[in-house]
Amino acid sequence: MFLKIKNIPKVNWSSEKPYNFKPKFSTLFFCCFGLMLFGLGEGLLIVSFTGASPWSVLAQGLSLNVNLSIGILTFLISVTVLIFWIPLGQKPGIATILNALIIAIMIDLCIKFVPTPSNYINQLILAVISVTTVGIGGGIYLVANLGAGPRDGLMVGLQKLTNFPIATVRGTLEISVVSVGWYLGGTVGIGTILFAFGIGPCVALGLFLVNRLFN
C-alpha cells in the first residue's frame, strides 16, 4: 500500500547522489518534468480560489503579527527550513535551485492561461486536481535524487529521523504549519484543508507509481 512507503525509491534514472551537477539527461528530464507538474499544481490551487497552501497561510499569519510582507516572510520561512536541514543531514542539489525557478514559471503560466471555474463545485474539483498534481510531481522529482526544495527536504529528513511513512510525515508537517498559520490569523479555505490533508498521500502515490513503472 502506497501510504506505507517510507523511502524514496531508486530507479534507473535516479542520480547516485544529490550533489550532482552533471546528471544524466534522463535524470534531469524527469526532475524537470516532476517540478513542472509540481508548479502546475501550485498554480491550479491559486486559480481555484479555494484557499492558499499551508505555508502561505503561515506566512500570512506571521505578516499580521510582525511588520514584514508575506513575500519577505515566505523567503525567511524557506531559509529557516533550510537551516533545519543541517541537523537532519539533508544536502542541496541542482533540484534545490530548479525547484524555485521552474515552479515560479509554471505558477505564472498557470495563472495567465487557466481561467478560474465559474462555479464552486468546479473550483473544488480543480483544487483536488491541484493537490494530486503537486503530489505526483513531487514524487517524480524526488526520485530523480538531485536534491529537493526546502519543504520536501524537510519532509525527507524528518522521515529518516522518525522512520514514519512519508505520507504521515508530510501530512503532519502540513497540518501543523496550517494550524499555526490559522492561529496567527491566516485565512484557511477548503483548498487549504484539502492540501494539508491530501498532499502526504499524493506524494506517496507519486513515489509508488514511479516505482511500479520503472522497477
Please give the residue ranges for each predicted region.
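Core subunits and conserved enzymes of cellular information-processing
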Residues: F2-N215
